[in-house]
């Protein structure tokens, strides 16, 4: 059976690995998943990521913990295949009063809501992280 929403699968794998206190989680790689992993690393939510393999690339994400607790408290999919959420730059959501981030897919690439506001572009709100 084919995977309907690969990004939701990625977020679920990260959540499950953190609940099981794993240090690394692996999944099939895609351009979008690598872009989201890059944003998570830049924002300090994960320790690192690596793409391995040529024929079937695999994405390995190194999870981050602080004092035994996962750094990511909440990881939710916003836009989904059945109901896409596109927001203008003025309507981009703030997560928990600006403490968290929304990851947005824009015509200038995948970035945080803060970077999208600074660039003056809106786009599809992929997920929220806190």
From Swiss-Prot:
GO biological process, one term: translation
Cellular component terms (Gene Ontology): ribonucleoprotein complex; ribosome
Gene Ontology molecular-function annotations: rRNA binding; structural constituent of ribosome
Keywords: Ribonucleoprotein, Ribosomal protein, RNA-binding, rRNA-binding
InterPro entries linked: Ribosomal_uS8, Ribosomal_uS8_CS, Ribosomal_uS8_sf
Entries under PROSITE patterns matching the protein: RIBOSOMAL_S8
Family that this chain belongs to: Belongs to the universal ribosomal protein uS8 family.
Function (record text): One of the primary rRNA binding proteins, it binds directly to 16S rRNA central domain where it helps coordinate assembly of the platform of the 30S subunit.
Subunit structure: Part of the 30S ribosomal subunit. Contacts proteins S5 and S12.
Protein name: Small ribosomal subunit protein uS8
């Amino acid at each position: 059976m084919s995977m309907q929403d690969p990004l939701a699968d990625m977020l679920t794998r990260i959540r499950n690995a953190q609940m099981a206190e794993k240090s690394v989680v692996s999944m099939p790689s895609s351009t979008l998943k690598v872009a989201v992993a890059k944003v998570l690393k830049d924002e300090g939510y994960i320790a690192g990521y690596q793409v391995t393999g040529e024929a079937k690339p695999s994405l390995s994400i190194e999870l981050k913990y602080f004092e035994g607790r996962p750094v990511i408290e909440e990881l939710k999919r916003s836009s989904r295949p059945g109901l896409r959420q596109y927001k203008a730059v003025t309507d981009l959501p703030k997560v928990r009063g600006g403490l968290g981030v929304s990851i947005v897919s824009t015509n200038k690439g995948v970035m945080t809501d803060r970077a999208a506001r600074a660039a003056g572009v809106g786009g599809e709100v992929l997920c929220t992280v806190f």
